[in-house]
Structure formats: structure tokens, C-alpha cells
Curated annotation (Swiss-Prot):
Name used for this protein in its record: Probable deoxyuridine 5'-triphosphate nucleotidohydrolase
Disulfide cysteine pairs (residue numbers): none
Reaction equations catalysed: dUTP + H2O = dUMP + diphosphate + H(+)
Alphabetically ordered keywords of this record: Hydrolase, Nucleotide metabolism
Single biological process term from Gene Ontology: dUMP biosynthetic process
CDD domains the record matches: trimeric_dUTPase
Protein's pathway: Pyrimidine metabolism; dUMP biosynthesis; dUMP from dCTP (dUTP route): step 2/2
Superkingdom of the source species: Archaea
GO molecular function: dCTP deaminase activity; dUTP diphosphatase activity
EC id: 3.6.1.23
Top EC class, one word: hydrolase
Function: This enzyme is involved in nucleotide metabolism: it produces dUMP, the immediate precursor of thymidine nucleotides and it decreases the intracellular concentration of dUTP so that uracil cannot be incorporated into DNA.
Length: 159
């Protein structure tokens, strides 16, 4: 069962959302920061090294993004309650512009201003305004006994 957007706000799952962000089945998340990837990352069996990022400078709050991959951070603070899991999807307008947003699963107990990968596949690029709603967070109940809460490296990120 998925929680309604209204319930996500009432339960404090999403804080700092913009006007119009509450949807029937979730809450829209907006762009807070955008970085281009400055070097390669490493993902091994035990270790990981995140690529450095260069903050994108936006003229008058509008970013001119060339085709490629970008890392972005959302404005909103998300707190996934125990017994629930969060999923983030691109808004359909973004897809129709030739762009994709990739998000990871947000486990029970995660709190932070999450990050996502924005892939601009449109050969003409994308003009993206800071603060624009770019993703929708949906939250579902996890069935069965809960054995632990999220304690990973990204707990409290961006706060």
C-alpha cells in the first residue's frame, strides 16, 4: 500500500516542499543543487569512491545543461518512517523533454536531502530552473517484521 501525498506531508516524511508539490500518490521533489561529474568514480566489493563534482552556475536561476550526466540534490528533507520504503521517479514532463532521473531506493529510517542522477539525453540539452519540481517521491509500507533501520553512509546527507 502506498501513502497519499497528503499523508506524507502530515506524517513529516517530506519537509520543505514547494506549493503544488502534493500529488495524489506522492510528493514532488525540487532541484536544490546541480553538479557535473568531474572525474571517474569507483565501486568495489568493499569500497566506493564518489566522483568529485563541479557546481553548475546558473544565470538568473536557470541552468543551461548540455547532454550528459549530472548529480543533483533535492531541496526537500525526506525522512522514511520505520516500516516503509521510498521510491523516486522522474516527472513525466522531464521524460518528454528527453531527460531521465535515476534515484536509489530509500530504506526505512533514512533521513536527508537525497541525491539523484540526471541524464540529459536530448541532443539539444535542457534549460532547468533551480527549484523546479523534477521528481515524485512515493512511499510504500514494507510487509513483514522490520529487522533494522538504515544506517548507511548517506544517513543525514545534505543536512
Amino acid at each position: 500500500m502506498f501513502l497519499s501525498g497528503r499523508d506524507l506531508v502530515l506524517l513529516g516524511v517530506v519537509k520543505g516542499h514547494s506549493n503544488g508539490a502534493i500529488q495524489p500518490a506522492g510528493v514532488d521533489l525540487s532541484v536544490g543543487e546541480i553538479e557535473s561529474l568531474a572525474d571517474a568514480g569507483f565501486l568495489g566489493e568493499e569500497d566506493k569512491i564518489m566522483p568529485k563534482g563541479d557546481r553548475i552556475q546558473c544565470e538568473y536561476g536557470v541552468c543551461e545543461l548540455e547532454p550528459g550526466a549530472y548529480r543533483l540534490r533535492f531541496n526537500e528533507v525526506v525522512s522514511i518512517p520505520p516500516g516503509h520504503v521510498g521510491f523516486c521517479f522522474p516527472r513525466s514532463s522531464l521524460l518528454r523533454m528527453g531527460c531521465y532521473l535515476g534515484c536509489a531506493v530509500w530504506d526505512p529510517g533514512y533521513t536527508g536531502r537525497g541525491q539523484a542522477m540526471l541524464l540529459v539525453a536530448n541532443p539539444h540539452g535542457l534549460r532547468l530552473e533551480m527549484g523546479s519540481r523534477i521528481a515524485q517521491l512515493v512511499v510504500a509500507r514494507v510487509e513483514g517484521p522490520l529487522t533494522s533501520l538504515y544506517k548507511g553512509d548517506y544517513q543525514g546527507e545534505g543536512l
